[in-house]
Amino acid sequence: MLTHWIWFAHRPGVSDRLKAVLMEHFCDPEDIFYADEAALRGLPELTREALEGLLDKNLTSSEEILEVCDRKQLHLLTYQDAGYPARLKNIPDPPMVLYYKGRLPEFDAYPTVGIVGTRKASAYGLTAAKRLGYQIGKCGGIVVSGLAFGIDGTAMSGALTAGGKTVGVLGCGADIVYPPSNGALFRDVERYGCILSEFAPGTPPAKWTFPKRNRIISGLSNGVLVVEAPERSGALITARLAAEQGRDVFVVPGNIDVPTCAGSNALLRDGAILVSSGWEVLSEYQAMFPDKLRREDTPVRMTASPEEVRAAAEETPLQVAQKPARPSETSNLKKKLEKKSIDNPAPTAYSDLDARLSGLSEDERVIAECLKNGARLVDDVIAETGLSTGRLLGILTMLELKGIVRRLPGKQIALK
């Protein structure tokens, strides 16, 4: 029953990671609801607070939320529904319930790109966001963002102008227009795209809700594009989450003299993929979605409107602003981000391989040996070596820094 899903999704003291663990032990939330203390106590990671939350069997609040959803025409998507995005389900802390308005796209059938950046964007950043949002939408991709002023909203506006698919992920209930002055965009996204939130209707924006929703933006996406972000930007949190989830991180290069570009430029230094068009982003996924992507030219005059530039310039710090990234936020990404290579894979004979591999660790040598006969898919190397994804990506980063391997389009790697 939906009431049990709502009850489970909003259990106090139960983390999203623990909810995913519980779903592995029980068939559905109804079984969890009827589980007694003895059945719950033996589960791993179960804290006292979580146990207390799970032993509270009152469904009144859940029934009230369901009534509000009916009244406000909010739809519910549960973790076990067929339409629940597979990419989102595979993150460590997926939301158990999503509330949405509008048309939910088939996330798994299309390449999805999260576009994020600063609220107080420059005219350059806003124009780039609008162009890339337009290009991704026009070429067949889904644009996911946060519906905020600045980069987020402008990118979504570009996707809507292209007639593309766009999804706004909120840090409040899906029935709340936030910020209020973004009402026109909110209504357009609701009408032509989708408004989505894990928070129950009526939940106000708060300082903790925005960082929490960022994992959904990255989790829904094949890759995250950072258009413009200062050093202490919430967009860097989304980029870090994307890297931890195994997503690509793309960055639009910014002016080195503009503070709002400092954080995004640092991502490039740490290995993010430099792009200057939406097609450069989508081309990374052309092999995965060959029938869904088409290259389209962008109108020459696709620029941010004076109203968008003015709104970003006048934007004041929000009382519920995202938790700022730590000073080391970008440097922590260095071991996780993939670098982009424009070279094409080609089998090569490495006559000096043994000499080049001297001094490498055992795991580094194992990976290099797998690439002796040419480029390989990352998934194939994982299967052959038995290394975990996280371990492999970390070793690949070190091999790149040592000049041993290079990344190729289509999730391939090869010896240099």
Predicted regions and their residues:
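Short, small/acidic-rich helices and loops at N termini and domain boundaries
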Residues: M1-A82, I404, K411
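Glycine-biased, small-residue-rich flexible motifs in mid-sequence functional cores and linkers
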Residues: M1, D70, Y79-K416
